[in-house]
Structure formats: structure tokens, C-alpha cells
Amino acid sequence: MAHKFVVTAFLTGSRILGRSFVAAYKQAQAASAYQRAQVKAGNTTGGASLSSGMTLDEACKILNVKPPAGGQANVEEVLSRYKRLFDANDPQKGGSFYLQSKIVRAKERFEREIGPLREKMEAEAEIKEGFKPKVYKD
């Protein structure tokens, strides 16, 4: 009689555990499919913002700069705004560590966005000017 109860409890527990694993797998598949659809639909910045959780628009609003259009971005302006805001929010001067970390994440997000564009522009400029190796004379 006791073995019947143990077997029933084991089977019921196994069924519950199996259903929960199936539900978790379906949820993970749906999230993965959604992410692939976002990337395929042209939202290529979605994958880049996963690590910081910040969009490019949010980063531009925090740093109070215009979003880079066609690879044209004023890097000096971004860095000067970053330094000014970072120093203004120094916790030892009465600022907020939370705001300071948001400013750092905004700069990192902006750099991650314009990094490949800058490399591409530098490569095009090098091709246009021709390859000029640095020659060292002893």
C-alpha cells in the first residue's frame, strides 16, 4: 500500500517537473525568435544594447548630443560632455554614483555605435589616399 503512494507521488512530481521544463523551453525559444526577428527587421542596434541595456537614443539624451547620422559624429563634443557630466556627478563632490554610472554607460554605448563606422571611414580614407607605410630609418 505504501509503495503505491510513493509511486503515485513520484509520477505526479515527475509530470509537474517535466511540464515546467517544457514551459521554460518554449519561453526561451519565443524570446530567441523575437530577438532574431528584431535583428532581421532592421533593428541591428538591439543586439548591441543587450550588454548595457541602453539604446543609442537614450545615450544621446543623457550626453545631450545628436545621434550620429551616416557615421558622422562629433566625438570631441561627446567626450567633452562626458567629462563635464562625469566630474559634475562625482560622489565625493556631492554628486550621484548612479548618475555617474549612467553617464559612463551612455559613453560606452555611443562608442560602441560609432566604433565600426569610424573604422570604416578610416579604411576608406586610407584607400583613397593610398597605402603609405611608416618607414623607420636608423
UniProtKB/Swiss-Prot annotation:
Give one Pfam family.
Pam16
GO BP terms: namely: protein import into mitochondrial matrix
The record ties this protein, via InterPro entries, to: J_dom_sf, Tim16
Leader sequence segment: none
Q: Where does it primarily localize?
A: mitochondrion
Instruction: State whether keyword Zinc-finger applies.
Output: no
Q: Which family does it belong to?
A: Belongs to the TIM16/PAM16 family.
Q: Know anything about its domains from the record?
A: The J-like region, although related to the J domain does not stimulate ATPase activity of mtHSP70. It nevertheless mediates the heterodimerization with the J domain of PAM18 and is therefore essential for PAM complex function.
Q: What is the name of the protein in this document? A: Mitochondrial import inner membrane translocase subunit TIM16
State the organism's lineage: Eukaryota, Fungi, Dikarya, Ascomycota, Pezizomycotina
